[in-house]
A protein has these predicted regions:
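Conserved acidic donor-binding segment of nucleotide-sugar-dependent glycosyltransferases
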Residues: 334-347, 354-358
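A short, active-site helix/loop in glycosyltransferases that binds the activated sugar's phosphate group
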Residues: 161-189, 196-198
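Nucleotide-activated donor-binding/catalytic signature segment of Leloir-type glycosyltransferases, i.e.
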Residues: 262-285
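Conserved donor-binding/catalytic core segment of Leloir-type glycosyltransferases
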Residues: 209-227, 233-236, 250
Length: 404
């Protein structure tokens, strides 16, 4: 897009997480921004110092260079706003004035950004921008257990909602939770599926079945109470030795909230020698390596709205065993490689692990597409701006749910 074309095009600004506190939302913010940039002028305004470092569960790796992706030159970026504002907020407002977005899309996942989003949304809305709030979950579950945080979000969120013209969620599960939690008035709420994390993993070539090699199972993600990793270890431990020796289990991810039960379960497992544990947040290059080694991925969550690692596994085309909870049911509904199991059920999980032996080397097409995701966003944006959506946008928007 030339400078002249960019000046006359629809301009969408995505506001979300930056790389200083790298997370799945950092990658989503990046990927949505770059996908939108293929259709319109797009920019990104990032949160930099998300919270005081001492308060962050992954404090030891804050600021580390963990990613190998960067925003392209045609996507202007401000990186970014600090939790305590200072000059960073003044510069963010200047960035909004310079870019003059027609639409801003706020990525919501934590109450830590609420005071900042309230300021940015009010500023952008008063300058004529339409505001879309994209909900990844109502509030981080660990954060919600901290004294006063649930009340803080519940008190200030209605103020933010005054400036929001439309909402986006990733599943009917999230739609139900959102409409039960807040009065949204007549603002449209669109279900738009999570786009693929195809910048982190590519479809892996099918491997020929080799019964002499162990099947490599991968759990990758932060280890927290709701992730259910201890259930995976329990399921693996219930296999007899002849069964277990046919696998290698890789558990990769840093521990949050002091949740050591999975590591304790590994230590007492009769198959501990078959389990590799990597207790840190790995780089993008390492992540690609683990998914490249894996024959299958396992996600034993107790609850979840969405899962970045699950999206990566589907982008890689791997067989996945995933618990049928929350938004994961819809995320995997059209993925032929998914084997859903009930949560908190190591016996069912163990049976699913054994079924993977018959799917060794299989690869599957990821049903998710950024083209469809962007079509749905464009349809919603046209609606907010009082324009008629394109035929493609209307078609893909109709695949979701619109609640008014």
């Amino acid at each position: 897009m030339t400078a002249e074309e960019r000046s006359s095009a629809l301009h969408v600004m995505v506001i979300g997480s930056g790389w200083h506190f790298t997370s799945g939302i950092s990658h989503y913010t990046y990927r949505l921004s770059t996908a939108l940039a293929g259709r319109c002028a797009a920019s990104a305004l990032l949160m930099r110092r998300l919270v005081p470092r001492r308060m962050y569960p992954g404090a030891s790796r804050v600021g580390a260079d963990l990613t190998n992706v960067g925003y392209p030159v045609h996507v202007p970026v401000y990186d970014g706003v600090d939790w305590y504002w200072g000059r960073s907020m003044t510069q963010a407002l200047t960035f909004i004035d310079r870019e003059r977005p027609d639409v801003v899309i706020l990525q919501w996942w934590t109450g830590a950004v609420l005071h900042t989003y309230l300021r940015l949304a009010r500023y952008a809305a008063r300058r004529g921008a339409k505001v879309i709030l994209e909900w990844h979950e109502g509030q981080d579950v660990g954060e919600a257990t901290m004294p006063g945080t649930r009340q803080y979000v519940g008190t200030l969120m209605p103020r933010l909602l005054r400036y929001v013209g439309a909402h986006v969620v990733h599943s009917g599960f999230d739609l139900h939770n959102l409409t039960a939690a807040y009065q949204l008035g007549d603002a449209p709420v669109r279900v738009i599926p999570h786009g693929p994390y195809d910048h982190l993993a590519r479809p892996a070539p099918a491997r020929p079945a080799s019964p002499d090699e162990p099947l490599r199972l991968l759990y990758l993600g932060v280890v927290r109470p709701f992730k259910g990793v201890e259930d995976l270890v329990a399921a693996f431990s219930t296999l007899d030795r002849a069964q277990a020796i046919r696998f290698r289990l890789m558990i990769v991810g840093e521990t949050w909230e002091g949740w050591t039960e999975p590591d304790e379960a590994i230590a007492r497992s009769p198959h501990a020698d078959l389990i590799e544990r990597v207790d840190r947040y790995v780089t993008d290059a390492e992540l690609a390596g683990y998914f490249g080694q894996a024959d299958a991925a396992v996600f034993p969550y107790h609850r979840s709205s969405a899962s970045g690692p699950l999206q990566i596994a589907m982008s890689a085309g791997l067989p996945v065993v995933v618990t049928a909870v929350g938004g994961l049911v819809e995320a995997t509904r059209d993925y032929q490689g998914a084997d859903p199991v009930p949560p908190r059920d190591p016996a069912a999980l163990g049976s699913a692990l054994l079924r993977l032996l018959g799917r060794r080397g299989d690869r599957y097409a990821d049903p998710h597409s950024w083209d469809r995701t962007v079509d749905s966003f464009c349809s919603l944006i046209d609606e907010l701006r009082g324009r008629t959506p394109s035929a493609a946008a209307r078609q893909h928007a109709a695949m979701g749910v619109d609640r008014r």
